[in-house]
Amino acid sequence: MSRSFDDLLPTALDDISLAELSPLTRVGDLLILLERWVERGWLRALDKAFVAFLSDLDPQADPLVLVAAALTSHQLGHGHVCLDLYETLKEPDFALSLPPEGDQQGGTMLLPSQLLAALDGAAWCQALAGSMLVAEVGDSSAEALQKPLVLAERRLYLRRYWTYERRIAAALRQRLAQSETPPEDLPQRLNALFGPANSAPQAIIDWQKLSCALATRKGFSIITGGPGTGKTTTVVRLLALLQAPAVQSGQPLRIRLAAPTGKAAARLTESISQQVQSLDVSDDVRQKIPSEVTTVHRLLGSRPGTRYFRHHAGNLLPLDVLVVDEASMIDLEMMANLLDALPPHARMVLLGDKDQLASVEAGAVLGDLCRDAEEGFYSPDTQAWLEAVSGEDLGKGGLRQGDAQQHPLAQQVVMLRHSRRFGQGSGIGQLARLVNQQQDQQARTLLAAGSHDDLFALALKGEQDLKFERLVLDGLGRGEQGPQGYRHYLNVLTAERPADDSALDDACWTRWARSVLSAFDAFQLLCAVRKGPWGVEGLNQRITHALFNAKLIESEQQWYEGRPVLMTHNDYGLGLMNGDIGITLRLPERDGEGKQVLRVAFPRNDGSEGVRFVLPSRLNEVETVYAMTVHKSQGSEFAHTALILPEALNPVLTKELIYTGITRAKHWFSLIEPRQGIFEEALRRKVKRLSGLMLGL
């Protein structure tokens, strides 16, 4: 019978002084320390349980192995696929996010830096290599395949994530080695879709045209670019480029479109629907270009309550082309599942912004795969072929030349470089570029200048500064056509409410709900963290209180009319996905007796402009969403976006987080700072998610 973690702990926890512990030489002492870390919120209960499991497997396990396992599991929760043993030893506390955000407790708690102070990287690796719990790369014996940990030089993995990484790498190598046959008249087809190349010396390279050309060569390609660079326009033309010859041959391609969230899928559905209609192609081709976008989970056929899908290597997806939008949100496990379920002959095209935040779950797949996108690294053969079929002069692009053997993946990646949404005169566009380049002083100067109508910076003087409430409630005070706050959608809710005697099945209720949902998209407050006075939890309470005091909402209780909620998990029974936003409204009861009940209105996200009304009692996995994390905002856009930073520097504060927050704004962006300087400190830090995915790619 397996022992629980509690069984492994000495009973007199409170009687043992932390100073007397020897956690790197005695397993019992290590377990006591880990329990204390869990009590303080430094480790997850899951990390603790994993160590208990390993101790059960090997009662003689070296504490060095167990502490490495605990930290690897902990890092997984922070998005890292593996633990780099040497990097961890350089700056243990910050590298491990220990103590975590918001921990203000004092005391004599043993920190990772103290625990690991005398440890040498080589000795740590040696201890792991000698453990019965750890398999080394290259050992494919039956015994090794049963070991829960994998050591790859200086990187330690949980076996499952090592397997995901290798499955992705193997699938990509297979697709990159597999040449497709582009149409013989590819140059003419490209010119028909994009126009002939401009030979003027100052002409801008048509990167959209190049990305479509490259996608015809192999079974895998990536189109990356920032907001407004035309990723959707490009993919619509790519689908026309691929589908036209197939339709003409009488064998149209089966094309599927997917996105990670319901909101991202709805945005792409709407955008593609509009653009397909304006394509200069025959009606036969137009009819075979799909506009309906599904979520990745629905595409694969998610099995509720499990991590398995209906489609997998033994039951492949019935398609010839798969396009995945917002690919930066796809984590390592999901990418492995997608590639497993893809037929060998099918093409896969990833769309996304490589500079956005990585997925919430482990991995930074798009960022890893686009590592060379900025500089190109096209081989002479790739460049010559692109120039021949497109007429473009890549010599003007300032790219670095590469070797197809050393950079096989780079040959199938194109970065779109010209934003049509944020032109040279856009303050948002300029700020996003400066943030991406980590030009912190220039970014501060731009914000301080006040010379752009679409940028605003608010420095707060303490937690009770009323300027925060004014911005969140009323925006920037420039009237109905300017940047709004939350008063706007609540005014729409009140002003446009249908007559009370309207029947529930009257279309006026759906029109009203759509109007309120649209008005809510006029403003969104984004946070970097969840905890503390400047985190999601505290700010949602504060804004709710401010709206109640302003008599804009009727209650501060859990459910009230006007409450905006965010789905935090998928609910397939209700057809709602993680990230979907709904607004609580008061509607007539179905029995028509004149009573009204609260229902939550969610957009149907299928391009139909429909609304799904759900009783609050059926929504178990929702939270109030006046404030949401930047992570949760990915795939969404808001007319006016405000980003509030915490006072203290935190590992999540990076230039990627700031960039993602800025680029959620369509028309106006506001930066809110409780402390001057935190913006610059964040810009100097980059996300570095540890993985070995690019080895060999």
Residue ranges of each PLM-predicted region?
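ASCE P-loop NTPase helicase motor core
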Residues: 210-212, 216-452
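C-terminal accessory regions
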Residues: 437, 580-697
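Residue-level signature of catalytic and energy-coupling elements of molecular machines
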Residues: 88, 168, 261, 295, ...
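N-terminal accessory nucleic-acid engagement/regulatory domains that precede
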Residues: 3-16, 21-185, 328
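Pre-Walker A adenine-sensing motif
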Residues: 200-216, 512-513
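Residue-level recognition of short, solvent-exposed, well-ordered loop/turn junctions
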Residues: 343, 558-561, 577, 633
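Conserved helicase motor core of P-loop NTPases
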Residues: 355, 359-565, 571-573
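N-terminal pre-Walker A segment at the start of P-loop NTPase domains
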Residues: 183-206
